[in-house]
């Protein structure tokens, strides 16, 4: 029977994470699986706990949102250890990209009977990140600023916090000159953001890169050019379906390595964590992580 180690950060949405784990834990134990729980005091500590558990050949459960999934998944990338996801955050974008359930019974089913699926990860290099590995996307611009505001929100949750953060970010945003180098070819433009996406979803289930696949060895590079604010909000609404990619203000490229530079120190984010400014380089690591997925979904 499978042996699990759940890593929970009690200081980051801890009540929600603990509640999500409770129902799943009961079902795992009733099925005869072994489960131990580790509580982290920071994302760096969570990564270390995950590495130790993986070294003991335990399946490591990331309990929380995309920041926790990205941190723990990044720590396990390239190690051969297996990751299980217990979605309990505001976005859960990477779990959504994998088609994972969010109800306790569905989560437990995948953890007990699912198959490890090899997925790509992203290596991030900047003045702050020294080859840090994340799962979903790296984005630089107004969306990173919106994400920062959403993370700081105290009264709002989920999509409401993201939209409030976006309104605040866009209101004070000025067009930025970007230099985006994709596999050695430079592309210059003025605009709102650049997203290097492994997962199609980001920003609380917004479909930023509809063609992105987590196991194709490529990053989708979405560049949103300068546009009137009214049109930008239309683009934001179209992120729900991915229809924005058909707009002339949106350009999509593909590549294995993406470097993002700008004419000012704009923020960038990675899997919901915003703590640095460009320049930043994102490089895909093909098939570097094994994640438990629905039976039959393994590649």
Question: What is the predicted function of each stretch?
Answer:
Residues 1-60, 70, 105-106, 298-299:
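ATP/NTP phosphate-donor binding region
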Residues 10, 63-65, 86-88:
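Glycine-rich beta-strand-to-loop/alpha-helix junction loops that act as flexible
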Residues 31, 40, 77-82, 88-192:
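Catalytic core of DAGKc-family lipid kinases
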Residues 46, 66, 194:
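Short conserved active-site loop signatures built around small residues
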Residues 68-79:
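Short Gly/Thr/Asp-enriched flexible loops that form oxyanion-binding sites at enzyme active sites
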Residues 139, 143, 195-210, 274:
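Glycine-rich phosphate/pyrophosphate-binding beta-alpha loops
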Residues 153-161, 202, 207-231:
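Gly/Ser/Thr-rich active-site loops/lids in small-molecule metabolic enzymes
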Residues 182, 188, 213, 223-299:
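ATP/nucleoside-binding phosphotransfer catalytic cores, i.e., glycine-rich phosphate-binding loops
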């Amino acid at each position: 029977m499978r042996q699990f180690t759940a890593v929970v950060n009690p200081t980051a949405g801890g009540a929600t994470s603990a509640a999500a784990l409770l129902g799943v834990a009961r079902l795992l134990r009733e099925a005869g699986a072994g489960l131990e729980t580790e509580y982290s005091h920071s994302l760096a500590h969570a990564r270390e706990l995950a590495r130790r558990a993986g070294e003991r050949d335990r399946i490591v459960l990331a309990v929380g949102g995309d920041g926790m999934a990205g941190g723990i998944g990044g720590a396990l990338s390239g190690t051969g250890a297996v990751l299980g996801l217990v979605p309990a955050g505001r976005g859960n974008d990477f779990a959504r990209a994998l088609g994972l359930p969010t109800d306790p019974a569905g989560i437990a089913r995948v953890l007990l009977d699912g198959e490890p699926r090899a997925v790509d990860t992203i290596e991030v290099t900047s003045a702050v990140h020294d080859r840090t590995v994340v799962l979903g996307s790296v984005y630089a611009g107004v969306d990173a600023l919106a994400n920062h505001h959403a993370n700081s929100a105290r009264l709002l949750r989920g999509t409401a916090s993201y939209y409030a953060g976006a309104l605040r970010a866009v209101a004070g945003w000025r067009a930025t000159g970007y230099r985006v180098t994709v596999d050695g070819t430079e592309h210059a433009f003025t605009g709102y953001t650049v997203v290097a996406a492994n997962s199609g979803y980001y920003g609380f289930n917004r479909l930023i890169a509809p063609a992105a696949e987590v196991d194709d060895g490529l990053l989708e590079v979405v560049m949103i050019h300068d546009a009137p604010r009214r049109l930008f909000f239309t683009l934001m609404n179209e992120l729900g379906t991915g229809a924005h990619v058909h707009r002339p203000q949106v350009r999509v490229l593909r590549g294995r390595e993406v470097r993002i530079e700008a004419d000012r120190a704009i923020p960038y984010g990675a899997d919901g964590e915003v703590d640095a400014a460009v320049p930043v380089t994102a490089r895909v690591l093909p098939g570097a992580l094994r994640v438990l997925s629905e039976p039959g979904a393994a590649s």
